């Protein structure tokens, strides 16, 4: 890992905050998507079965993104991959509402899965580097921040949906 957090940032607190921010963003994006699934289903007029098929795109993307991220992290450093994957995850979250059919929703979710799977691996690799600098277990704090992000993303997504804003 040529560009790990441990080698690029001096103060461990700054590195911890940076990685925690990525965990929060990842959780918020996931939380926001989950609460908008019914709206996307309704907008596309998908049956429960058709939605289930389309949702299969997310784990398909994860199957690609997870190993891709590991390879990319070795080649370019997990810090760089984390940044690119976070931007990609946020960008691909905009695709499901733009889908015009179950097939395009599936394709959008494959891309979302690739990006979010890549982010998951890269940010956890960064978290391991930060944890090593602390010389004590702190990994659970990153995962707690992910959960907090999920809560925040769900709350915002739910509030926006309640206001009648389309997916």
Question: What annotation goes with each model-predicted range?
Answer:
Residues 8-38, 42, 110-111:
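Pair of pore-lining "gating" transmembrane helices in MFS-fold secondary transporters
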Residues 63-78, 161:
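Helix-to-loop junctions at the C-terminal end of transmembrane segments
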Residues 109-144:
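Cytoplasmic helix-loop-helix junction between adjacent transmembrane helices
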Residues 142, 146-167:
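Helix-loop-helix hairpin linking two adjacent transmembrane segments in secondary transporters
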Residues 31, 58-67, 150-151:
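Residue-level signature of mid-helix packing/kink "hotspots" within the transmembrane helices
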Residues 79-89:
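Primarily marks hydrophobic transmembrane alpha-helices of the MFS/SLC 12-helix fold
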Residues 15, 37, 46-55, 139:
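Juxtamembrane helix-start elements in MFS-like secondary transporters
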Residues 97-108:
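Helix-loop junctions at membrane interfaces in 12-TM secondary transporters
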